[in-house]
Amino acid sequence: MAVSLHRLFSYVLGALVVTAAAHKSAPSVTSTAASSTLTGIAATAPTIGPSHQVGRLPALGWNSWNAYSCNINETKILDAANLFISLGLADAGYEYVNIDDCWPLETRDASTGRIVPDPSKFPSGISGVADQVHALGLKLGIYSDAGTNTCAGFPGSLGNETVDAEAFAEWGVDYLKYDNCNVPSNWTDAATPPDNDWYNSNSAIRYRQMTAALNQTGKPVHFSLCIWGDANVWEWGDRVGHSWRMTGDVSASWSSISSIIAANAQHLDSVDFFSHNDMDMMEIGNGDLTLEEQRTHFAAWAFLKSPILLGTDLNNLNSTQLDIIKNAQLLAFHQDPIVGTPATPFNATASAPSTSPPEFYAGKSSKGTHVFIINTNTTATKTFEFGNVPGLGFGRFRVQDMWTGKNLGTFANKFSITVDTHDTAALLIHRA
């Protein structure tokens, strides 16, 4: 439902928006290094990168959109923050409480040019909410758009990057989700930019302007590029932000979750410290996902090192769902301080069939070697040879179930496990 609402608003408003942010006047910050080989706006676009005081590890938190859409207010935001504490989510590492679209009034302040928080929704203002979130030891996120309006029609930040970044910093904002709706036609791109240089495309420059504006405030802000996988963002995203959306919105269905895993699996070389492919907000607690599909949803986001932003009314999570999203071993892999790279697909055996998404993944952490197995079909026994796991070789190995912490035994040369329909096995492996 979220994708249809966002895109519907975007398309309707996009048809009405005139090119209010012309190329000659849109940049609100100056370049730190112009290139003589570039022309037009690219020649003067800012090149400064994102702060490395934040964003080293993929974000853990919550976002309001999937739970409440536009029906938000400070009571709901602060309720989520307090539930981080009472449900043990903060202890598990979750820290960002993020406000999505629909938080401001529909027009900017006439004298300051600033976006104005809707006083009927946020009577304490964003700064007042930030103070209360910070008092809990958590961080606050806000939402804007690299277009003239947000997806729901509220003021966007294109052409107003400096004034908006200054406001966000003054309010104590720690995280910015920056969407991609209502882009004027003169800020769009041809099918392929000159020299296939997507970093200097109009799309990238819209985001680079906000990077520079955030940097100028002096306050480190985790910058999330909600660019829907456009403009080959995985090629340049780490030069502009800390994470970047790889697709349109995920929905609470197996087909949506599996398709996003498949799409992301093609671009895992871009994932490392300060550099994360964002597979979108979580749907655990929403829709009709089976228990096994919710486990896979969480596990895949964890082992592929996507940001994990919960997207439901936290009051409604049951104990089983809480156990999934607080699983200590999967979160430890996701947040590993030594190894920044994700698990990647490998061929389990010489005769293993090809699937979409891939079923077998292997990765390293500071605790050892891990294998993750997604069953894309009905319940079946899955087998892999230790010698096919990168870095293992053949021999005898101890295998531990990461979901339960249970030791499964010692095995020679290969390992087999029964995996339920659409479930994921998560294994930690050490040489015996």
Task: State what each model feature region is.
Residues 409-432:
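C-terminal beta-strand-rich structural cap/linker in extracellular carbohydrate-active enzymes
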Residues 138-156, 211-232:
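Aromatic-lined carbohydrate-recognition surfaces of secreted/lumenal glycan-active proteins
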Residues 1-25:
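Fungal secretory targeting signals
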Residues 58-64, 93-100, 139-144, 174-179, ...:
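Structural recognition of the beta-strand scaffold that forms the well-ordered cores
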Residues 163, 219-313:
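Glycan-recognition surfaces
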Residues 301-304, 309-311, 352-392:
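Carbohydrate-binding surface patches
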Residues 80-195:
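Aromatic-lined carbohydrate-binding/catalytic grooves of carbohydrate-active enzymes
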Residues 21-78, 83, 221:
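N-terminal module-boundary/linker segments of secreted carbohydrate-active enzymes
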